[in-house]
Structure formats: structure tokens, C-alpha cells
Amino acid sequence: NLYQFKNMIECAGTRTWIAYVKYGAYTYAYT
């Protein structure tokens, strides 16, 4: 179950994670 979740994050969430990091850095820069 945890492995499946991890695999889902690695496959479908990689680009989303990158976008999230960029958004987080953008928000942090203007905080």
C-alpha cells in the first residue's frame, strides 16, 4: 500500500512536485 503510494508519487507526481517546489519558492520569496 505504502509502496503503491510511493510509486504513484514518483510516476505521476514528479512534475507536480517540481511545480510545487517552484510555487513554494515563489511564495517564500514574497513572504
Curated annotation (Swiss-Prot):
GO cellular component, one term: extracellular region
One GO BP annotation of this record: phospholipid metabolic process
Catalytic activity: a 1,2-diacyl-sn-glycero-3-phosphocholine + H2O = a 1-acyl-sn-glycero-3-phosphocholine + a fatty acid + H(+)
The organism's place on the tree of life at top rank: Eukaryota
GO MF annotations in UniProt: phospholipase A2 activity; toxin activity
Free-text comment on the cofactor: Binds 1 Ca(2+) ion.
Subcellular location: Secreted
EC number of this enzyme: 3.1.1.4
Record key words, sorted: Calcium, Hydrolase, Lipid degradation, Lipid metabolism, Neurotoxin, Presynaptic neurotoxin, Secreted, Toxin
Family in the record: Belongs to the phospholipase A2 family. Group I subfamily.
UniProt protein name: Basic phospholipase A2 13
